[in-house]
């Protein structure tokens, strides 16, 4: 692993200036190039990955978010661990790679699960690539390009943040554009190894560092010109073929609809079970009600008698009732049918006190009520 990384570092290192043989030197040393097995295999896999990323990026939306977070996290943590001292010790390349991959995997999971974070990283990647193209254009088109370190830093961060915000606003459009541009860049870098052993990568690295301008071979410009062409082709293919009729928002909505449908199905099943339980309980309750009716038969309906109509004269005072009792006591002293003093009437106490018969009568024979 260490020898492979050292080989890649040697390939990426700028050529020595001592043996300067003129401006055509970058194109002259073609026969002396030697290709290693491991870098060739890695570049071939990256080329295949770039093709999928360029032409099927938006279709593989979740995978794009995961790989973007994995790449950012792994590269940043690897550089920090390899260049800086951690706990007063210089970590080896293998340890730095392992730590970078571990933390990069966590970053990839975060960008995949939190969609807004993933879209922000996708837009940031697009802005960085556009910033690199801007720096190359400034270097070649300007007669006196700026050599300050803050210029590339400001261009990269400014364009990165701008495209990150735009990606959050127009998600489908800028996600398609970002995947096409990044996939084309990966294809170009992998091809550059087989053409010039990363001469284009060294040139871009010097432009970011604001280093002195060095002559490059015409094949470098051909490889660099393939980048925007492949990016445009990737956008067209995704727009018309691979991403047509597909939307990452519909995927989220369809999952929510599935959950809602499952909830509805569960509610229907619960209702059916509750109705079955009610039907089972109804015969038992009916039997209990019949038994209760047999034990406690309902009384027959009886019509309430009409209330007796009373008048003002029907109300008897307690004094009259007491006089009735006194007369009854007096009447027992005489035989039935005997004579009593005139002006009084013999009253039987079995008589209902609520009767409408007058209590006194005129002078005459005894009247038994």
Curated annotation (Swiss-Prot):
Protein name as annotated: Transmembrane protein 198
A GO BP annotation: positive regulation of canonical Wnt signaling pathway
Membrane-spanning ranges: 37-57, 60-80, 93-113, 117-137, 148-168, 181-201, 216-236
Membrane topology: Multi-pass membrane protein
GO cellular component: cytoplasmic vesicle; plasma membrane
Signal sequence extent: none
Region (Disordered): 266-308
Keyword Nucleotide-binding in annotation: no
Location within or outside the cell: Membrane
Family: Belongs to the TMEM198 family.
Keywords, ordered alphabetically: Membrane, Transmembrane, Transmembrane helix
Keyword set includes RNA-binding: no
Main localization (coarse): membrane
Lineage: Eukaryota, Metazoa, Chordata, Craniata, Vertebrata
